[in-house]
Amino acid sequence: MVVVNKTNLLLLLLSLCLTLDLSSAQLRRNFYAGSCPNVEQIVRNAVQKKVQQTFTTIPATLRLYFHDCFVNGCDASVMIASTNNNKAEKDHEENLSLAGDGFDTVIKAKEALDAVPNCRNKVSCADILTMATRDVVNLAGGPQYDVELGRLDGLSSTAASVGGKLPHPTDDVNKLTSLFAKNGLSLNDMIALSGAHTLGFAHCTKVFNRIYTFNKTTKVDPTVNKDYVTELKASCPRNIDPRVAINMDPTTPRQFDNVYYKNLQQGKGLFTSDQVLFTDRRSKPTVDLWANNGQLFNQAFINSMIKLGRVGVKTGSNGNIRRDCGAFN
């Protein structure tokens, strides 16, 4: 049996903290100032063009970023395509609903960068996804903010690594807090990043349990607004095609704003994992605060996105810059 005294434990914790600090220490604004000075404008132009083609680009890119960062860090491992020898992250059951427009946004931005000689293969796919996510938030009416750059692309992507790392629609605050804490994110970060549900859509089958089969006592979740239940049942009848999706935010689905929190106050959170933010006493005060002050929410969202972008950063021999975002070099 190994005995760990307090001194050894303290040293272990300090070592862990130092490792985490070093992994994100290389991140900085204007990281590519010397190698590709116009990187952010090039990516922005590509993203803007993609958004003009389809609005789905916005929520798809935002969701792709979360799914990437929550599984072994922000390293573009979610971009990797499966091969005969490896089933990659993107083909895990929980990632199959990631819209293709998110992947295409990164691919198009990469192509735009590679068309500039001094930028070709100089910018990581992980950084491209980070910039693109910032840009889609802003293009949807959300805040503009500076992003830290300098990530390398991951060298591994397996479907087996995904399980248990992503939030589920039925999660309560305890489960959500635990998942976010594993990535160094606080309760406030969790509430702020959940605000991304002000954009996007979800498949009807994800809400069936709340409006048809809640529990043995009642078929409908009592925390759902009655008018919203009627609306959901009309949009999502029992026999609907499982590919059909509905807006996450029933009020302003194409606008990045704080209406998500106002919806929660009215019992109009689409998922259980949304509505519990209002019904749980630990998160309710923050929901109320941001529902009443959009600027405070925007600032909190920026801070939490920057923290999210530091999760699992790859450095040195743990990563590289991919020539193709969908395949290892």
Curated annotation (Swiss-Prot):
Heme b binds at H197. Its cofactor is heme b; Ca(2+). Substrate binds at P167. Disulfide bonds join C36-C119, C69-C74, C125-C325, C204-C236. Residues 1-25 form the signal peptide. The keyword Disulfide bond applies. The active site is at H67 (proton acceptor). Expressed in roots and leaves. It catalyses: 2 a phenolic donor + H2O2 = 2 a phenolic radical donor + 2 H2O. Coiled coil: none annotated. It is found in: Secreted. Ca(2+) 2 binds at T198, D249, T252, D257. GO terms for biological process: hydrogen peroxide catabolic process; response to oxidative stress; rhythmic process. One of its GO terms (cellular component) is cytoplasm. Keywords: Biological rhythms, Calcium, Disulfide bond, Glycoprotein, Heme, Hydrogen peroxide, Iron, Metal-binding, Oxidoreductase, Peroxidase, Secreted, Signal. Removal of H(2)O(2), oxidation of toxic reductants, biosynthesis and degradation of lignin, suberization, auxin catabolism, response to environmental stresses such as wounding, pathogen attack and oxidative stress. These functions might be dependent on each isozyme/isoform in each plant tissue. Exhibits a Ca(2+)-pectate binding affinity which could be interpreted in vivo as a specificity to interact with the pectic structure of the cell wall. Belongs to the peroxidase family. Classical plant (class III) peroxidase subfamily. There are 73 peroxidase genes in A.thaliana. This is Peroxidase 50. It comes from Arabidopsis thaliana.
